[in-house]
Each structure stands twice: as C-alpha cells, then as structure tokens.
C-alpha cells in the first residue's frame, strides 16, 4: 500500500510498521531490505547532498566527526567518509543501529570500501545519543517515529552535538 494513498499529502509521514521493523524478520529478507535502502540512497543522491553541506561547513584542515543514527547497512556513512577522505579531510565516522544484522552488514560494507567507519548497537529512540560529533545525520528513519518521538530525538541530538 502506498503510504500517501489516502491522504495524498507528501508531507505526512506513514507510521505503519515496515517489514524491517519485525525483530523476527528472516536474515535474507532483512539483507534484501538493506540493499533496497542502499538503492534508494544511491538514486536520491543522499551522499552527494550531505557532502555538499559538509563542504560548505567544513575546513579540510580540521577533523570532522560524523555520527549516523539508525545507519542501517552504513552505506551513507561509508560513502560520506570515503568522499571526505578523498578531499583531504580527517574523518571519524561512527554509525549506530538497533539491529545486529544491519551492523554486521555495515561493518562489511565499510571493510569492502576501505573505510575507517565504526559501528555500535543503539536504540536511538530510548538510548543516550553519543556526544562529541560535529555532524549528526539520520537517513530514512524519522518517518518511523511519532511527532513526539521526533521532537524528543531532535532535542537530544542537538544536546549531544558539538556546536561551534
């Protein structure tokens, strides 16, 4: 079902559970869903858009610390880390996800890409957001949350970010 079918409003999030939200989802289905998200990120030029913003903000002589919340297979974080490294940035990239299988896929993705990104398990809705990052992102995740959870998470992200 199209999540916007009834409302016709592209600004309204669909809070319905997705296949990937099932903790009992079979491994091959979960990996297939992660590959699908990677395709979405590729087609929508997610890394390119984030990179453009980081290049506006960042100083190539400075260290950039990036945190990707609900990182899934880590494709956005790894691509961003590699693109910044190629441009001379020193990058510390860290991704968090609640799913051990997604984290395993993210680590493998980083290894294959020659990325120094690291990953850890975290329930970003209920857990403590790691501090000490300059740039915090979350791609294709917030639509899962209620308005109240989004506001709470964004506030906790702002509190954890190094601002300067």
Locations of regions flagged by a protein language model:
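Hydrophobic adenine-recognition pocket in adenosine-nucleotide-binding enzymes
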Residues: 141
């Amino acid at each position: 079902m199209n999540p916007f079918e009834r409302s016709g409003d592209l600004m309204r999030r669909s809070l319905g559970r997705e296949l990937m939200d099932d903790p009992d989802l079979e491994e091959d289905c979960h990996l297939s869903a992660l590959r699908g998200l990677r395709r979405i990120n590729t087609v929508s030029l997610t890394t390119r858009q984030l990179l453009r913003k980081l290049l506006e903000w960042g100083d190539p002589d400075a260290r950039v610390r990036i945190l990707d919340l609900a990182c899934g297979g880590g494709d956005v974080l790894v691509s961003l880390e590699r693109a910044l490294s190629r441009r001379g940035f020193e990058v510390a990239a860290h991704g968090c996800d609640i799913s051990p299988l997604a984290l395993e896929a993210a680590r493998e993705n980083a290894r294959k890409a020659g990325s120094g990104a690291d990953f850890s398990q975290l329930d970003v809705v209920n857990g403590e957001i790691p501090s000490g990052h300059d740039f915090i992102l979350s791609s294709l995740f917030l639509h899962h949350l209620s308005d109240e959870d989004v506001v709470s998470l964004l506030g906790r992200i702002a509190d954890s970010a190094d601002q300067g």
